[in-house]
Regions:
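C-terminal beta-signal and adjacent terminal beta-strands/loops
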Residues: 273, 505-506, 561-564, 568, ...
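Gram-negative outer-membrane beta-barrel transporters
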Residues: 558-562, 581-663
């Protein structure tokens, strides 16, 4: 141990004096310089752009290994691995033209490679692209990604669903740390605002190898807004207006960077009235108000990179209790309502050694949730405080083998102070250790990993034994071993095959273990089961991709077997006129996939046609259908790109038809849902007025005011339709 510590100290001090730089030139195949290419080093949070001669320069770089990516609209992204730097280094890049979306570095998987190089298929979407679709919330935008849906309560509350799994079976990461906000409840939303978020990555399938418990169904990984390029200052103001809810989204941000220091801050405010259905009536008390603030400061030099970020989010949500009642455009919520405060503090560090590096991420999340029935005295008040940590050591590359080992953990406390207890006061502790390796040869890659986890949950007794709201004391420990194996190869130059097999697990949550009372979100009496076992699954994924200059096609298939799947089942009893449901377990299977294509006909360089189809089926071992499985969906988009002389650039117009099929494969406590078609229009671009420019976008969602009820809407049981026609106008000014 002493020798290891001494080696780390010597390695650290040897790079303190390093003052390395990388410079070069970016050109196209005709040897012409490319101006405005984004050059970015993700581990350093450092970026710049090429000048009019295609030249760029990075200063104060570490001796250790890192990556630099080169991205430019209309060209294929390149990622360059940098190691063993001299004082001055030259890296010249030649980019080739591409009509499809730019390739992106995937942060949520172990080795941070471009998606085209990644063993696992990960969906990557920029928040700007999702915002261009005119959605009013982040979760609405996410639900447009193939394989992702939402369980909604009006327009204000949405929970992500990945291939039929949701709640505690889907993990959410933001600012590099795990988000914990009582996600077991269907009426508990995502708790994130899209302002100040750069992009989202979606892992569809078990990811317990990297993320531990609860990553059984997948991961939503939100990448925060990038800092400004070195030695620049940027500020912007954006405003959106929504006709349906008479809503407004406002955001203002600024950021600046030197060669070493970085700073950014962004504030936003969203306010919406009750949403209007197709016949013109409003759904009472679906109004909401949201305040969000994000800030960050970063420092990097030749030895390490460190970024401290903070996010404050306040939500005031009305709960639709009486369906379509009093008609109002007020934005002041009525009873019942929810008040939620979220504080997220993260510290992300990368320490560089000569041929290796150490990542250390620390996070603290404070979630304060209050529910008010008929007065400003909270009937339910829960405070969830979570500290988590994640450390990964990247070994020096050994030939063609890359290796990572890591530890991960969490300490969490839940405290109640309201009249009602939904779950007891409790403490949860997680610890996990893992290792993974990547071997690459010719056109093939193999990636494998192993992990061990332990979760311990202890809770206190509460209430009077035999009465509603009584909780027995609990002390349970859950262990799990998990593994993953992935293979990627090029069957031919344009055809790529990916095959992944991975296991995942989820320990029962507090509600499943301890519930004893009426769950207001479901209007039923729920009884927990302290003897529940860990859910354990194994999923096989097959992905085929074909891509040439003008045509792109993909097909994703999966089969997910879950042992000890936890769900509620009626006991046949009633208490206080509520049906009694108990938590039980059974094995389950989910299977399905996504298929799609992107066609860009030559020589019509301005025209794109995209289509995708997604399906998932879930069954218990007795062949009954699982609840909350999204209906099949077929999505078609025709998109044009254009430019009008010198005053309108990066213009686009899109026509979208989203066809959701009937859902007849329902559990015993659900009803079937009818299919529907929604037509959406989009238009936008950059308006240039002399030296000034601003972005504008105009969307018409549900253009023909279709009356429909989504299968995963929690208002479906009351026969309340989803939102009607919504015209959205947005502008963004660079100040």
């Amino acid at each position: 141990m002493k020798k290891l510590i001494l080696a780390l100290i010597l390695g650290f001090t040897s790079i303190l004096s390093a003052q390395n730089s990388v410079s070069g030139k970016v050109i196209n195949l005709e040897n012409q310089p490319l101006s405005g290419v984004s050059v970015y080093a993700p581990e350093l949070h450092k970026g710049t752009t090429t000048d009019e001669n295609g030249k760029y320069e990075f200063k104060n770089l570490p001796n250790g290994s890192f990556r630099i990516t080169f991205t430019f609209v209309g060209f294929t992204t390149q990622s360059k691995a940098i190691s063993k730097l001299l004082k001055e280094n030259t890296v010249d890049i030649t980019l080739t033209e591409s009509v499809f979306e730019m390739d992106e570095v995937v942060v949520s998987t172990p080795f941070n490679k471009l998606q085209s190089q990644n063993v696992m298929k990960v969906e990557h979407e920029s928040i700007k692209t999702l915002q261009q679709k005119g959605t009013s919330t982040l979760i609405e935008g996410l639900a447009t990604i193939p394989g992702v849906s939402q369980i909604s309560t009006g327009t204000s509350i949405g929970k992500p669903v990945i291939r039929g799994l949701s709640g505690n079976r889907v993990l959410v990461y933001s600012q590099g740390v795990r988000i914990e906000n009582q996600q077991f409840g269907d009426e508990h939303g995502l708790g994130l605002n899209d302002a100040g978020i750069e992009s989202v990555e979606v892992i569809k399938g078990p990811a317990s190898l990297l993320y531990g418990s609860d990553a059984l169904g997948g991961v939503l990984y939100f990448n925060p807004e990038k800092f400004a390029d070195a030695n620049t200052f940027k500020a912007n103001f954006s405003q959106k207006y929504f006709t349906n809810t008479q809503g407004s989204n406002s955001s203002i941000g600024l950021k600046t960077s030197t060669d070493n220091w970085k700073f950014l801050a962004r504030g936003s405010f969203n306010t919406h009235s009750d949403y209007k259905i197709a016949d013109g009536e409003r759904v009472t008390n679906t109004r909401y108000n949201e305040t969000d603030f994000k800030t960050g400061v970063g420092y990097s030099n030749s030895s390490f990179s460190s970024v401290l970020r903070y996010n404050y989010n306040k939500l005031d949500l009305g709960m639709p209790d009486n369906g379509i009642g009093e008609q109002s455009t007020s934005k002041n919520t009525e009873f019942p309502r929810q008040g939620i405060f979220n504080h997220l503090l993260s510290l992300n560090n990368v320490i560089f050694f000569e041929n290796s590096k150490l990542d250390v991420d620390l996070g603290y999340i404070a979630n304060d949730r209050s529910e008010f029935e008929d007065s400003n005295d909270a009937s339910l008040h829960m405070k969830l405080n979570t500290f988590n940590y994640n450390a990964k050591y990247h070994f020096p590359k050994l030939g063609k083998i890359e290796t990572i080992i890591g530890v991960q953990g969490m300490h969490q406390t839940n405290k109640n102070s309201g009249e009602e207890y939904l779950i007891p006061d409790a403490t949860t502790n997680d610890f996990g250790v893992f290792g993974t390796a990547n071997y690459e040869w010719n056109n093939s890659v193999v990636q494998a990993g192993l992990r061990f986890d332990n979760r311990n949950i202890t809770s206190q007794a509460h209430g009077v034994e035999g009465e509603e709201g009584y909780f027995l004391p609990l002390d349970r420990s859950f262990d799990s071993f998990n593994a993953s194996l992935g293979y990627k190869t090029k069957l031919a130059d344009p055809l790529t095959l990916r095959l992944n097999v991975a296991t995942g697990f989820r320990a029962p949550n507090l509600a499943e273990l301890t519930s004893n009372g009426v769950h207001e979100g479901t209007n039923r009496y729920e009884i927990g089961n302290a003897a529940l076992k860990t859910e354990q699954n194994v999923q096989t994924d097959l992905n085929l991709e074909y891509k040439n200059t003008h045509f792109e096609f993909f097909i994703n298939g999966f089969y997910n077997h879950v042992n000890n799947y936890i769900y509620t089942s009626p006991t046949g009893e009633t208490r206080d006129d509520n049906d009694v449901f108990a938590y039980i377990q059974n094995n389950a299977n989910l299977y399905g996939g996504e298929v799609g294509l992107h066609f860009h006909p030559h020589p019509l360089d301005w025209l794109h046609f995209e289509t995708s189809f997604e399906t998932v089926t879930g069954r218990k071992a007795n062949n009954d259908y699982l609840p909350l499985i999204p209906a099949n969906n077929w999505n078609n988009t025709l998109r044009t790109e254009f430019k009008i002389k010198n005053w309108f650039e990066e213009g686009y117009a899109s026509l979208n038809l989203s066809s959701t099929f009937s859902q007849n494969n329902v559990s015993g406590f659900e009803t079937a849902s009818k299919g529907y078609n929604l037509v959406n229009l989009g238009f936008g671009g950059t308006v240039k007025l002399g030296k000034h420019a601003f972005d504008v976008n105009l969307n018409g969602n549900n253009l023909f005011d279709k009356k429909y009820i989504a299968h995963l809407s929690r208002l479906k049981t009351d026969g309340i339709p989803n939102i009607g026609r919504n015209i959205v106008l947005g502008v963004n000014f660079n100040l």
